Amino acid sequence: VDPEQAYDWWAADYDSQPDNLMLALDEQVFGSLLQEMSLAGKQVIDVGCGTGRHWNHLLSGHPASITGYDVSEGMLKKLQEKFPGQHTVKLNDHRLEATASASADLLISTLTVAHISNIKETLQEWDRVVKPGGHIIITDYHPNALARGGRRTFKHNTETVAITNNVHPVPDVIAMAGQLGWQLLRLEERNIDDTVKHFYEKQQALSLFEAFKGTPIIYGLLLVKNNAAQ
């Protein structure tokens, strides 16, 4: 199912998933990367913001503003219920039309990149809106797991729905970022190992755990835009 439809369906229950492995690991990875910087007075863009999973964390840093972009009206409605009056924009393609060039101090995109087919054009658009010296944080379902048949799924009306994903190898994403003049500051990866086994036990999916054990399941990148001279 395409991401727009899938996340419209998922929106009602998205914030009620205490046993969701990816969301738990994303909290760890994103939090680790975000602690590298101060948000005070900064302009922040969240691409694929969903229901605003990270917005309590972001707002606690007192940024000047956050703009959330997402393809799903359902997810944006949930975000507005949680954070009334915050600036959100429905995405129709890769263009961040509500954001001026070289205006963002920080652009984040969590658990979203694999949903993007035109990744090169998307990164170019992100480059347009980020200031020279600004930062980019990306986290996502690890492409190694997707390439091995891993799927992003959820329950909808008792049916299991799988969301369309694209495999963008991490070295390719880093290389494309480098071509834009972005410098990689940190790479974080988490593997499926015994520390996450209990998630699979709760889902009665130990066979899946054994099949994917040792496989990277999530990655995170912290980058800085160093292309002022370009």
Language-model features: locations:
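Conserved Class I S-adenosyl-L-methionine
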Residues: 185-230
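A short glycine-rich, Lys/Arg-flanked "PGG" loop and its adjoining helix->strand segment in the class I
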Residues: 120-132
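A short acidic, Gly/Pro-enriched loop at the edge of an enzyme's catalytic core
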Residues: 98-107
